Amino acid sequence: MISITSAEVGMKINEWHRHIQKFNVTDAEMLKAEIERDIEVMEEDQDLLIYYQLMAFRHKIMLEYTLPSDENRMELSEYLNKIEGHKKKLDNMRAYYYNFFRGMYEFRNGEYTRAITYYKKAERKIPTISDKIEKAEFYFKLSEVYYHMKMTHISMHYAELSYNIYKKHELYSVRRIQCHFVIAGNYDDLENHEKALPHLQEALKGAELLKSKNTHIYATAFFNLGNCYHKMDNLNKAARYIEQALVQYRKINSDVLPQAYHDLALIYFKQGKKEQAMDCFRKGIRSAVDFKDELFMNLFEALDVLYIRNGDTPKLLNIFSRLENGKGYPYLEELALLGGNLFDYNGKIEDSIICFKKMVYAQKQISKGECMYEI
């Protein structure tokens, strides 16, 4: 049997990583299988095996993003357990990858402050990383988690760093589109929707070129435009874009379906289109149950309280309490604002004040998140 050097396998793992970064699932899967065959006949090298396990972990994160399933989530945990046993042996590069990929794992699980903790540890190793694309990937991931934590200016800083690298590399179109999403989302959080729109329109233009091979990003481009118009109170345009997003998300049975149905139901309720709202409401609850999405089960329950049962304050407060966690605070902020405005419109001033106080509480918890990771 012909032996192969660990250096040769290491080069293949680097190439595998490039396919993962580009979301080239088929090429990544083929190269992974080839590397696993090579490892069977490779000279013994424990460091290389750790590198392989790290990249296999990153590969699973990619699959869980593009093809969400309980099986992929379970395998992620298995890879993590294997890598944990080798932590003391990690050199600078592998320590960087370990903390970076672990941050991605925590982010996918909605543990945003834990994700930031690992990302900051990885950032200390960034000076040892010479590859520009690797740096762009890292900056993008930081921009993403800070966006979810509503740390807007920090997110914008990292998104700009990432985009300025990716725009010089034609092959990384998915990441360029995603940078536009994050930048636009930050502008929306700053209530500067007019600046968000050009980024979202540019993202849709790029996503249209990828629609045959990346339905998810194409759907998300419509969805984000719909959300922006929703924030601008242009409900007709918002509904049209989210309807188009739903068509695409249904094709791939995306785990974003509960959110898309929820947002469209909310828009229809605001427009007084009760029949369409109830249709989205029912479909959304079914999809939330199918995906075991507890967050959106709670948010659909809130829609029921606010728009179907015409306000049940104790029940709404109970839902608020379920959203008091790192992942839930941004949704709690928006829900409390929605409830406050609705109660105010209906003349329920005391209930409105309760909601607005809860909104301020959520904002404070989000701002505290910046200090919750280790320095």
Curated annotation (Swiss-Prot):
Keywords: Coiled coil, Cytoplasm, Hydrolase, Protein phosphatase, Repeat, Sporulation, TPR repeat
Any one Gene Ontology BP term: sporulation resulting in formation of a cellular spore
EC number(s) stated in the UniProt entry for this protein: 3.1.3.-
PROSITE patterns in alphabetical order: TPR, TPR_REGION
Conditions for induction: Transcription is under the control of the ComA-ComP two-component system.
Subcellular location: Cytoplasm
Coiled coil location: 24-95
UniProt repeat feature TPR, residue ranges: 96-129, 177-210, 219-252, 258-291, 297-330, 333-366
GO cellular component: cytoplasm
GO MF terms, alphabetically ordered: phosphoprotein phosphatase activity
Domain of life: Bacteria
Regulation (activators, inhibitors): Phosphatase activity is inhibited by the phosphatase regulator PhrE.
Entry similarity comment: Belongs to the Rap family.
Purpose of the protein: Involved in the regulation of sporulation. Acts as a phosphatase that specifically dephosphorylates the sporulation initiation phosphotransferase Spo0F and inhibits its activity. Probably plays a dispensable role in the overall context of sporulation initiation.
Name listed for the protein in its UniProt record: Response regulator aspartate phosphatase E
Organism: Bacillus subtilis (strain 168)
Gene name of this polypeptide: rapE
